[in-house]
Amino acid sequence: MPSQDYKDTLNLADTPFAMRANLAKREPDWLAAWEADDVYGKIRQARAGATKYILHDGPPYANGQIHLGHAVNKVLKDIIVKSKTLSGFDAPYVPGWDCHGLPIEQKVEAKHGKVGQKVSATEFRGLCREYARTQIELQKADFKRLGVFGDWDNPYLTMNFHQEANIVRALAKIYDNGHVTRGMKPVNWCLDCSSALAEAEVEYQDKVSDAIYVSFDIVDSGKVAALAEIDGNIAAVIWTTTPWTLPANQAIALHSEHNYSVVATENGNLLLATDLVESALSEFKLENKGVLATVLGRELEGLHAQHPLIEARQVPLILGDHVTTDSGTGLVHTAPGHGLDDYIVGLKYNLPVENPVSGTGVYLESAAVFAGEHIYKANPQIIAALHENGHLIRHTKIEHSYPHCWRHKSPIIFRATPQWFISMETKGLRERALADIPTVQWTPAWGQNRIESMMTGRPDWCISRQRTWGVPITFFTHKETGELHPNTLELMETAAQRIHEGGVEAWFDASCEDFLGAEAADYDKATDTLDVWFDSGTTHFAVLDQRDELTNPADMYLEGSDQHRGWFQTSLLTSEAMYERPPFKQVLTHGFVVDENGRKMSKSLGNIITPQEEINKTGADMLRLWIASSDYRYEMSAGKTVFKGSIDMYRRIRNTLRFLLANTDDFDPATNSVDINELVSLDKFIIERAQTVQAQIISAYDAMDFHQVTQHITAFCSQDLGSFYLDIIKDRQYTTQTDGQPRRSAQTAIYHIVQALIRWITPILSFTAQEAWEVLHGADSYVFTEEWYTFPEFELSAISNDDWQRIMLAKDMVNKHIETARGEKIINANLSADVNLYADGAMHESLAKLGEELRFVLITSNATLKPLSTVPAHSASTDEQTDSNSTGVVDLVVEVHAATGTKCVRCWHIRDDIGTDSTHPELCARCATNVSGDGEVRHYA
């Protein structure tokens, strides 16, 4: 036991910044305080007049609680907005919601019944509005709990009256620019929805279907010389997986340049693509009894075949470029009312666009066969009828990828109905969009190829829906001609004004007479609603153009990778149709969340992780850190192991912050700062290192490489600070005089670093950043209004950056030798070691600059530097280490042995100068002067 207690002479660090974050419990209180103090408003005030940066929120659908994918999306947006704010931009964030459409209708129907049965259409729309509002409030609470800042009190809602009105105005502008067309055209149709579907509402799943080969007897083969001499009937064979579409067949398509052969079989003479004869006959289990003729497809154009189910119908053989010989027979069953390729080729030949199927899948009374029967029940009846009349060549089952409704997960059909379209070709919309896609920055870069391929192949956009809850297509069509009213634009503006005052109900509840007066008898008022993708796709006009704090085009659209076929595409098309330019400067996409085995999360697998449960366990900051540290460009893995990695990363950052804050607890930068040029060399070096890291972090934020941001931060905390700088300065912080130059120099450096570090983590660890900020600046100050830290200007002088790189290299080698010596029981701690370093050249020069302070860098009681030539013969062999600042190899020998002397009871260094000050017989000379003298001075470490 020391005779005197020196504890009170040490600078023991303390801070209110707790070791345990307790985020899950404390974050709600912070949120409540921030909301009460209008932090978002303070940020707007702080950036008033600055250059704008607009991230436009893609609206989530107002239905159900948020899932982990929602959390990823909103947090990524928040990181960008907060980082741009730190970069000096005025970056307002206006969240939005998509409020119309079928899922909400279904929820209301389940509770209140269908329109016309238990509720009127007007009542139904009111119930839909109310349901959407309740869902928005639930989701809003979850988004705010994530620490996402935004104008939550004034979000945009596609069901706001003024926004519904502006959606109508957007349609009017697109109509005025000549992009809206009407026609009987096959569209994606869900029998469960009883409505058309947008491309984005269709997903592909495997399905088992009936596959049949059917023969059509050619009735006028004699018109082709090569076929005229063939004895017996010739039958063209088609293949289809949708037998129910055969009643709508209007033609058989062939390719003009493919060869077709008439093959004799025990089932008669069959016409097949020459390249498919063998595979087809093998499938039919028929023998090739000889090829009777071979002709080019174009020679068969204009022949007719008897429909196998409808006696009164003969169908032509036509030519189409869509016909291939990859499989089947090379002859394609063509029903323009049930397929887009069929429809397109049908236009060329003026084929009827017959649709004998109702919206619920029942054959209409006008159908030539099977009237009143549901198409799926008719399938086996059609197959049986073909078998009975001898036209069924083969019937099998196949599993194939088939389009399904994304809501009902049920197979869709293609069905021609009168619909409104935005044409891709009439005014060159496709061409214009493709020309502008390369002008946008796509992140990741492959997003450009993806949307280009989708834009190249997409059909006209069917914008009409047969729903109750949606924005109306405010058209009036003439009862006889089908033409739109000549004053359509004026009528649409009138409708928009009324909707602005009373919502979409102002259209639906009004009569034709309310708009047209005496003309009403000649016109039909449209009852269709707009595709909800039109609602969200026109927010560049209905939101960005209408709010003073926003700008159009936006700087950034950010959504999941599925939105190349959804919101990105519909926004691009509507903007091109309205303004002839994209609505965004940059588009960023993120991957989906999967479990740790790479599986999609689903109830059936029992692997769903909700953001709510994770936040309740560890807090929103931990979830935000997982999101930021994941490479969002790919699938994002979530689970216990992955989350543990984020927890460990968080602890490293928090512990570093705690050390920095504790060691500046008594530091007043106004009175205690050391002039930047008078700092200890090590302190200058770590500030310069922090400047370098800050530049890397800001660059990574600007590039949206948030996982790189987290790596830079954690590497700086663990390597530059934890393993090097903070370890070295502990002695200086604790043992030198409280107000002495060595300690205040370190505190000055720490102050600059913690100011920067808090800002670095603010976009990601928002709660923790503000908690740390308040320790420095009080509860009335917010880091969210700050900009990136500006470090003081200075130059390294006595010891250069290259010197420090070599010194760190030597320190690493010393640490390895000390660990070996500890393992061999030569020493039991760093301070029980003396080290000799034998070096030459640049390494010797760099180490020599530290002089007597070398031991403080190495954290040993003594350190002696000697020329390499003096290394004892018994010493360890030379260690070779590559000098990172040169191309050569550095020779350095490290020798570790037990320190000789007496242990100082205050600093624990083992020295031979213990008791040289008689007033303090148990202290080393350094501690004695720090306790009762002038205090030590440090120059280098």
Swiss-Prot record:
Its cofactor is Zn(2+). ATP binds at K603. InterPro entries: aa-tRNA-synth_I_CS, aa-tRNA-synth_Ia, Anticodon_Ile_BEm, Ile-tRNA-ligase, Ile-tRNA-ligase_type1, Ile-tRNA_ligase, M/V/L/I-tRNA-synth_anticd-bd, Rossmann-like_a/b/a_fold. Its EC number is 6.1.1.5. The keyword Protein biosynthesis applies. It is an enzyme of class 6 (ligase). Zn(2+) binds at C904, C907, C924, C927. The keyword Cell membrane does not apply. L-isoleucyl-5'-AMP binds at E559. Keywords: Aminoacyl-tRNA synthetase, ATP-binding, Cytoplasm, Ligase, Metal-binding, Nucleotide-binding, Protein biosynthesis, Zinc. One of its GO terms (molecular function) is isoleucine-tRNA ligase activity. It is found in: Cytoplasm. GO terms for biological process: isoleucyl-tRNA aminoacylation. Its main location: cytoplasm. NCBIfam families: ileS. Belongs to the class-I aminoacyl-tRNA synthetase family. IleS type 1 subfamily. IleRS has two distinct active sites: one for aminoacylation and one for editing. The misactivated valine is translocated from the active site to the editing site, which sterically excludes the correctly activated isoleucine. The single editing site contains two valyl binding pockets, one specific for each substrate (Val-AMP or Val-tRNA(Ile)). This is Isoleucine--tRNA ligase. It comes from Psychrobacter arcticus (strain DSM 17307 / VKM B-2377 / 273-4). The lineage of its organism: Bacteria, Pseudomonadati, Pseudomonadota, Gammaproteobacteria, Moraxellales.
